[in-house]
């Protein structure tokens, strides 16, 4: 079944962007997933094609109108998760990307200006999603990141399923260090265990490295990893 991505945006020319390259681009050409953009401005209600207005109660900037967004959303089938890219939303992680990859598709709403009228979130039951604790110019960049995280997990996109399962976050840990030729680079060699041919020793080394890196760099992840490990 083809994964269908639909993006509501004021800048459809930003898509597919980098998703037209590499693995995601190949999968798009092969029909593993599809991408449709919806120009929000097409659903404006006045001759000026206005999509925003001043915030109620005063304040800086402009707010995207609920009625315009509702018309744009209602023009699309309601057959997949409806997500609003928002810095106050649920933080994207690998587990969430994997759960979305199991669905039939996603409909993404890209905000601009100071955000969107809260009533559209309530009325159309949009789930807010964030890619990190920082502010972007609009939701389009975040939508591209989210789609990249999803698409690479779709069946048939990645050539090596084992590789995907060994990546950072898949088992709750950061990925272990990787090495390849040349054997020596500027005086630095490859850890001997990796060229020993002893598969169990290599697996143990990689696990130890992953745990050590996670403990040093992401103590929050390491605490969760230990908690989950104690349950099993």
Swiss-Prot record:
One Pfam family matching this protein: tRNA_m1G_MT
Protein family per UniProt: Belongs to the RNA methyltransferase TrmD family.
EC number: 2.1.1.228
Gene3D superfamilies recorded: 3.40.1280.10, tRNA(m1g37)methyltransferase, domain 2
Source organism (scientific name): Bartonella henselae (strain ATCC 49882 / DSM 28221 / CCUG 30454 / Houston 1)
Coiled coil (residue ranges): none
The organism's place on the tree of life at top rank: Bacteria
Entry's Gene Ontology molecular function annotations: tRNA (guanine(37)-N1)-methyltransferase activity
Cystine connections: none
GO cellular component, one term: cytosol
Ligand binding (S-adenosyl-L-methionine): 111, 131-136
UniProt name for this protein: tRNA (guanine-N(1)-)-methyltransferase
Subunit structure: Homodimer.
Gene Ontology terms: biological process: tRNA N1-guanine methylation
Keywords recorded for this protein, A-Z: Cytoplasm, Methyltransferase, S-adenosyl-L-methionine, Transferase, tRNA processing
Function: Specifically methylates guanosine-37 in various tRNAs.
Reactions that this protein is recorded to catalyse: guanosine(37) in tRNA + S-adenosyl-L-methionine = N(1)-methylguanosine(37) in tRNA + S-adenosyl-L-homocysteine + H(+)
Compartments where located: Cytoplasm
